[in-house]
A protein has these predicted regions:
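Flexible glycine-/small-residue-rich
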Residues: 7, 36, 65, 143, ...
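Conserved P-loop
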Residues: 1-49
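P-loop NTPase motor core
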Residues: 37-42, 48-130
């Protein structure tokens, strides 16, 4: 089974893949089809042509991050509306492809700080409303109080809001490792 990986952040690391795959790197690497769009328009073209690549041999479509090139092009209100329509269409298309081909879909998003009530800032995804609309499951990742650990919070599962489910994990040379509390 293959993975289609759209690296819009230009952060895919072959070194990290080698660490995680270990001695299996020669069998793992050919299973990843990597796209590196340089613009939001190029990302759109790649997504619109993914259907030609999906088959029973594709297990995962991953986009890291789906909002980075979108964010670069944000401008005035008219341009923002146009970009929102394009992003919305991209997500609709990705969801359609994933459902029709029974393929897992993983999207990451950039985040930004938003000043909330009483001047308190909070972190939220770029294009949060569009992402929430199209996502069945949402995980929020945060640094934990212990510097070497991360925390994942399940915010939405199959359309239902969830607030109290979370886990601790560590990023190790082998990949993601569960951590006992």
């Amino acid at each position: 089974m293959k993975t289609l990986f759209i690296d819009a952040d230009n952060s895919f690391s072959t070194t990290r893949l080698s660490q995680i795959a270990g001695y299996d790197i020669n069998s793992v690497a050919p299973l990843i089809i990597l796209f590196k769009p340089k613009s939001f328009r190029e990302q759109n073209t790649i997504i619109e042509n993914l259907e030609n690549l999906t088959s029973k041999k594709v297990a995962l479509i991953a986009v890291d991050t789906v909002t980075s090139l979108y964010r670069v092009e944000l401008g005035g209100i008219e341009k923002t509306f146009a970009l929102n329509r394009i992003l919305n269409r991209q997500l609709a298309y990705l969801v359609k492809i994933a459902k029709e081909s029974h393929t897992a879909l993983l999207l990451t998003s950039q985040v930004h700080s938003v000043l909330g009530k009483e001047g308190v800032g909070r972190i939220e995804p770029v294009a949060e409303r569009v992402l929430k609309f199209w996502s069945q499951n949402i995980l929020r990742l945060e640094c934990s109080e212990k510097t070497h650990l991360r925390e994942a919070f399940l915010e939405k599962h199959l359309g239902f809001r969830s607030t109290d489910i979370h886990i601790l994990f560590a990023l190790t040379e082998e990949g993601v490792t569960d951590v006992e509390r």
